From Swiss-Prot:
Listed Basic and acidic residues bias regions: 358-398, 526-539
Pfam family, one: SKIP_SNW
Subcellular localization(s) per the UniProt record: Nucleus
Function (record text): May play a role in chromatin structure and function.
Claim: DNA-binding is one of the keywords in the record: yes
Region annotation SNW: where it falls in the sequence: 177-343
Family statement drawn from the similarity comment of this UniProt entry: Belongs to the SNW family.
Organism, as annotated: Drosophila melanogaster
Name this polypeptide is given: Puff-specific protein Bx42
Record region (Disordered): 333-398, 486-547
Lineage start: Eukaryota, Metazoa, Ecdysozoa, Arthropoda, Hexapoda
Record-linked InterPro entries: SKI-int_prot_SKIP, SKI-int_prot_SKIP_SNW-dom
Coiled-coil segments: none
The encoding gene: Bx42
Protein's UniProt keywords contain Iron: no
């Protein structure tokens, strides 16, 4: 015996919301029907025990107010749809029952935003209101009034321009007098002479035509705002193709000088941003003319510089030759003075025997030779470094007959002499190559012992052997530097002949003019004394004449 058997049968159906949700979550089994069934709500008055569960139970309408159960037609207000947002727009109808599609254009804009959704909204009000009074043609009277007002306004503007340009303006005509009734606020016998009202005559003040303007009238007035731009009607949006995207792609602005963030920019992007490939390169023909003119100017300038340098070299060479001549003369004089030579005019006639002066000269010459031999021995005993330095500083004898790198000249006819070793030899390329094992580069001496240089400083047989002693080998083995040209002023006959000794120079008495300067300085006080004596004698003469 159960409890349900004891209880009476329930009159209402049992419905539990939680059980219903579980069934919906599980999903009711789908049973295919052979005949389509149309689900509809029961008719009105028979819905006592019926509860809508699906969207199909509501049909196209809303909730059922007579059923006291929470209802969510089309899912509106359902607990699961509270936080969700939908882009669906509610369908609205206009006064004629047509769907208002302007809601699509207004979507996403504020309520105060003006959105033109039809062509009629873009037309001005004059076009829409064709029957308005403002658009009607005016009558003849209105046309005449407007014409007269326009004429007067234009005349006024023209007269103002003319009068402002004139240096002297005419006096303006005074306007008519105006009469104004004035009622004072303070009434009484003590005010306004007991009068309650007054009549005031208002007259325009007279203006001075010669008075300059008081205010600045040429101030520039800013322009008013322009008319609003015309609206642009856009075509419906369509998907942009890849080609259009590439055409609309604008390269970024890349600076050639600044890169604050240190980005690594490829060269093709730099060239695209530079835009050099978009413009056609055109080289002006005057660039070639300018380059040619610059080349000609540069060539002429180089020629001028070369000519100047050649001239300077010639002048420097002449100056050098002049100084060398002067040095040769000074050396000649010094050698003559050192050797004690005298001019034949100043020499006294010598007797048959040797005088004391000649003996003294020979002794001096022997002493000088002895000093030179002592110096050579000291050089040979000196250290190698010091010896090379002293040998460089040795006094060099100069000969005008020996020139380095130049052929010698014969004494008779002046023909050029060549090295005889070069003649009658078959040592060219056609004679074949030498033996590889032989080393005959220095098999022969470069200079022959029978040349002029070997005998030019050789003492003659008539010279005194005591003067030279054992200096012959030293003189032969000594290398001398020779000039490449003759001395200026030397005769060819003397140059061609053989010389028995080195070149001797005459010493100049006063090369820098110091003796002459000292003599002038010494004579200056004497001249001053002579002038003073002359002045004193002249003054004495004048005094004697006066006396």
């Amino acid at each position: 015996m159960s409890l349900s058997s004891l209880l009476p049968t329930p009159t209402n159906a049992i419905w539990d919301r939680e059980d219903e949700r579980r069934l919906v979550a599980r999903g009711a089994p789908k049973i295919g029907a052979l005949v389509s069934a149309k689900i509809a709500a029961p008719p009105y008055g028979q819905r006592k025990d019926w509860v809508p569960h699906t969207d199909a139970d509501f049909g196209d309408g809303g909730a059922f107010p007579e059923i006291h159960v929470a209802q969510y037609p089309l899912g509106l207000g359902a607990p699961g749809n509270v936080g969700k947002k939908s882009d669906a727009l509610a369908v609205r109808l206009d006064d004629k029952g047509k769907v208002k599609y302007d809601a699509i254009a207004r979507q996403g804009h504020g309520k105060d935003k003006i959105v033109y959704s039809s062509i009629s909204q873009l037309l001005p009000a004059e076009v829409l209101a064709e029957d308005a009074d403002e658009l009607q043609r005016p009558d003849e009277e209105t046309v005449m009034e407007t014409t007269e007002e326009t004429r007067l306004a234009l005349e006024k503007l023209t007269n103002q321009k003319i009068t402002s340009a004139l240096p002297v303006r005419h006096a303006q005509k005074a306007g008519p007098a105006q009469y104004i009734r004035y009622t004072p606020s303070q009434q009484g016998d003590t005010f306004n002479s007991g009068a309650k009202q007054r009549v005031i005559r208002m007259v325009e003040a007279q203006l001075d035509p010669m008075e300059p303007p008081k205010f600045r009238i040429n101030k520039k007035i800013p322009r008013g705002p322009p008319s609003p731009p015309a609206p642009v009607l856009h075509s419906p949006s369509r998907k942009v193709t890849v080609k259009e995207q590439k055409e609309w792609k604008i390269p970024p602005c890349i600076s050639n000088w600044k890169n604050a963030k240190g980005y690594t920019i490829p060269l093709d992007k730099r060239l695209a941003a530079d835009g050099r490939g978009l413009q056609q390169v055109h080289i002006n023909e005057k660039f070639a003319k300018m380059a040619e003119a610059l080349y000609i100017a540069d060539r002429k300038a180089r020629e001028a510089v070369e000519a100047r340098s050649q001239l300077e070299k010639k002048l420097a060479q002449k100056e050098k030759e002049k100084k060398e001549d002067m040095l040769r003369m000074m050396a000649q004089r010094a050698r003559e003075e050192r050797a004690g030579l005298r001019n034949p005019e100043a020499a006294e006639p010598s007797g048959s025997g040797a005088t004391g002066s000649e003996v003294r000269e020979r002794n001096d010459l022997r002493a000088e030779r002895q000093r030179e031999r002592q110096r050579d021995r000291n050089l040979q005993r000196a250290a190698p470094e010091k010896r090379s330095k002293l040998q460089k500083e040795r006094e060099r004898d100069i000969s005008e007959q020996i020139a380095l790198g130049l052929p010698a000249k014969s004494a008779g006819n002046g023909e050029t002499l060549f090295d005889q070793r070069l003649f009658n030899t078959t040592k060219g390329m056609d004679s074949g190559y030498g033996d590889d094992e032989a080393y005959n580069v220095y098999d022969k001496p470069w200079r022959d012992s029978n040349t002029l240089g070997a005998h030019i400083y050789r003492p003659s047989k008539q010279a005194d052997s005591d003067n030279y002693g054992g200096d012959l080998d030293a003189i032969v083995n000594t290398k001398r530097f020779v000039p490449d040209k003759q001395f200026s002023g030397a005769s060819k006959e003397a140059a061609a002949g053989q010389r028995s000794g080195p070149v001797e120079f005459e010493k100049e008495e006063d090369p820098f003019g110091l003796d002459q300067f000292l003599n002038m300085a010494k004579k200056a006080p004497k001249r001053a004394e002579e002038k003073n004596n002359e002045r004193s004698s002249h003054s004495d003469r004048k005094r004697s004449k006066r006396d």
